[in-house]
């Protein structure tokens, strides 16, 4: 199928810099959450890698929405499993070597409106994959995509947050279904690694974005990008105090393979681009300055919108970088590519 130019550039960049071709040659890789941003771009990268290097990689993908999958991949050579991750998962057809578990709800309002489903998706889906990994000798590695939200509330700008730090999460707040769900499943992964020697690693991802993000996405970065494209004021529904780093899609995907192939089982690794740490408010002003000075920043705080508590999480990536990973895209380049992508699909 014909791919968007910006996405194709990202895919070709990934393939040109991918250092692990021999390690995954002729292997079968299961990817869950295949129609999400990370899952879909990751699969496209693997398919392109096959074309360029003739690696014989087999991709098995889990997704719920057939039409969305067809829109993303057309008739590409992917072996599909059509189901929700809370349903019993039958992998008996394949000898899976690697699992990259991307499936997760990502919308804040979903966590608030469907906390039970949020928890079940995290726990039941991951437990099935860990069970498979514990019982099949073909398994070489698994990465679980966790989140910086598993850290909870931390408000300290003075130090980089390392993987051994833990902040407070209120267990009787429905929005905690996501953050506590991620924390719980990290514990589950560590337990399987410890007791059953499952080679699973946890990736604590910061906010990841890039070409391929839906124009319907309601996350802050997407709303801000669309505002500067349309020449509209950037309207914030919080004070914008929360701060975190960011990571471009292909940089994050590259990190997942470093963890899959070089990470220590049972351990968690922060995934973020150094020197991108910024508050939401400062990000708004940065985008206005860099991309459309005719826009203004307007603050209209509202309650009960499902937003996370104020946190200031500057993640340390030394542990990941020690494996050899390094990012290629800085914050301005990330938004430049996202904005150009949005313009290309208008």
Q: Language model features by range: what are they?
A:
Residues 28-48:
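N-terminal Rossmann NAD(P)H-binding glycine-rich loop of SDR-like oxidoreductase domains
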Residues 32, 62, 99-105, 142-148, ...:
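SDR active-site strand-loop-helix element
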Residues 82-121:
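NAD(P)H-binding glycine-rich loop region in Rossmannoid oxidoreductase-like domains
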Residues 127-175:
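Conserved Rossmann-fold NAD(P)-dependent oxidoreductase catalytic core, especially the SDR/UDP-sugar
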Residues 154-164, 187-244, 249-260, 285-290:
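NAD(P)-dependent short-chain dehydrogenase/reductase
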């Amino acid at each position: 199928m014909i791919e968007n130019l910006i996405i194709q550039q990202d895919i070709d960049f990934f393939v040109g810099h991918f250092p692990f071709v021999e390690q995954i040659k002729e292997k079968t890789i299961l990817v869950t959450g295949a129609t999400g941003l990370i899952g879909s771009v990751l699969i496209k990268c693997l398919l392109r890698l096959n074309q360029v290097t003739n690696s014989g990689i087999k991709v098995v993908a889990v997704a719920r929405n057939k039409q969305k999958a067809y829109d993303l991949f057309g008739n590409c050579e992917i072996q599909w499993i059509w189901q929700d991750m809370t349903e019993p998962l039958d992998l008996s057809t394949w000898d899976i070597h690697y699992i990259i578990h991307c499936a997760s709800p990502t919308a804040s309002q979903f966590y608030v409106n469907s906390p039970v489903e949020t928890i079940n998706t995290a726990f039941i889906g991951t437990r099935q994959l860990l069970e498979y990994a514990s019982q099949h000798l073909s398994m070489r590695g698994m990465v679980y995509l966790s989140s910086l939200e598993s850290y909870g509330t931390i408000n300290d700008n003075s130090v980089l947050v390392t993987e051994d730090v833990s902040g407070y999460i209120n267990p009787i707040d429905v929005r905690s279904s996501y953050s506590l769900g991620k924390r719980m499943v990290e514990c589950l992964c560590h337990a399987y690694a410890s007791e059953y020697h499952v080679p699973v690693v946890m990736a604590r991802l910061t906010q990841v974005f890039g070409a391929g993000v839906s124009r319907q996405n309601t996350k802050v970065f997407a709303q801000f990008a669309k505002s500067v494209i349309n020449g509209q004021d950037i309207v914030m529904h919080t004070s914008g105090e929360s701060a975190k780093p960011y990571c471009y899609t292909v940089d994050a995907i590259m990190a997942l393979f470093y963890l899959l192939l070089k990470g220590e089982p049972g351990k968690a690794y922060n995934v973020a681009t150094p020197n991108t740490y910024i508050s939401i408010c400062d990000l708004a002003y940065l985008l206005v300055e860099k991309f459309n000075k005719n826009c203004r920043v307007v603050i209209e705080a509202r309650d009960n919108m499902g937003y996370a508590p104020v946190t200031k999480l500057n993640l340390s990536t030394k542990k990941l970088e020690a494996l050899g990973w390094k990012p290629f895209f800085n914050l301005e380049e990330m938004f430049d590519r996202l904005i150009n992508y949005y313009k290309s699909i208008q």
